[in-house]
C-alpha cells in the first residue's frame, strides 16, 4: 500500500481547472510511473525456423516483463508466455540498459504467464542498485473509478504508458483450473 503523495485537499466550492492543473496532474502521474519503471524489463525472445525455400531465418520479439523476485540465486521476471514459448534465446534488458541472458523457469498456459530468470551472479552492483523488485499489492481494496496506470508496453511497444480508470474491478471469469478476478479498465 502506498501513502498518498502530497497533502489532502478538501474542495467546498466548484473549481475550474486550467491547462496548468492538468499538466501538473499528469506530471505527478508520470512520476509514479517512472518509479515503477525500475521494476520493468524488456525481454527479447529469439527463435529460428525454416521458410518455404528451406532457408533458416531468425525472428525476434520484444515484450515487457516485471521483476517479481530475488531468491538469492536468480532475479525472477514475470512475462506473457505466448511470445517466448518457442524461443531458443531469451535476453533481459534492465532499466539501466544492461542486457543479460535468461532462461524460462516455468509457465502456465491457462493464464499465459511465465517466469524467466537471470543468474544473479551475472548482474553487476550498479544494475542491482538501479532495479527494484515490484511491490505487489492486493486488488481486493480497489473500487470502480480508481485511477490506474498501465506501464510496460500497453500501446504495443516497450516504454509506452497509459492512464485510465477501473470500470469493473470485481469481474470474475472461469478457466480450466479455477476462477479469476479481472480488473477491467477504460483503456483501449
Predicted segments, located by residue:
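Short conserved beta-strand and strand-loop elements enriched in small hydrophobics
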Residues: 43, 88-96, 148-153
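Active-site region of chymotrypsin-like
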Residues: 121-134, 162-188
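Short, conserved beta-turn/loop elements at beta-strand boundaries and strand-helix junctions
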Residues: 48-49, 60-61, 70-72, 85-86, ...
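N-terminal activation segment of mature serine protease catalytic domains
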Residues: 2-67, 77, 84, 89, ...
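Gram-positive cell-envelope targeting signals
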Residues: 1-7, 148, 165
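Active-site substrate-binding loop(s) of clan PA
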Residues: 31, 67, 103-105, 123-157
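Terminal peptide-recognition signature
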Residues: 38-43, 65, 75, 79, ...
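Catalytic-histidine neighborhood of serine endopeptidases
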Residues: 70-112, 120-121
Amino acid at each position: 500500500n502506498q501513502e498518498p503523495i502530497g497533502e489532502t485537499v478538501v474542495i467546498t466550492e466548484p473549481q475550474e481547472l486550467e491547462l496548468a492543473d492538468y499538466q501538473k496532474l499528469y506530471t505527478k502521474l508520470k512520476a509514479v510511473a517512472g518509479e515503477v519503471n525500475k521494476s520493468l524489463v524488456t525481454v527479447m525472445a529469439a527463435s529460428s525456423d525454416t521458410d518455404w525455400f528451406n532457408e533458416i531465418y531468425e525472428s525476434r520479439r520484444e515484450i515487457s516483463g516485471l521483476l517479481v523476485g530475488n531468491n538469492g540465486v536468480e532475479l525472477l521476471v514475470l512475462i506473457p508466455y505466448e511470445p517466448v514459448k518457442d524461443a531458443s534465446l531469451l535476453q533481459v534488458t534492465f532499466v539501466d540498459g544492461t542486457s543479460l541472458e535468461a532462461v524460462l523457469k516455468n509457465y502456465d498456459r491457462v493464464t499465459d504467464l511465465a517466469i524467466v530468470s537471470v543468474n544473479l551472479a551475472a548482474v553487476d552492483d550498479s544494475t542491482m542498485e538501479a532495479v527494484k523488485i515490484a511491490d505487489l499489492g492486493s486488488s481486493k481494496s480497489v473500487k470502480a473509478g480508481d485511477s490506474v496506470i498501465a506501464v510496460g508496453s500497453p500501446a504495443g511497444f516497450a516504454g509506452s504508458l497509459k492512464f485510465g480508470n477501473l470500470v469493473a474491478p470485481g469481474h470474475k471469469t472461469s478457466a480450466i483450473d479455477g476462477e479469476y478476478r479481472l480488473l477491467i479498465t477504460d483503456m483501449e
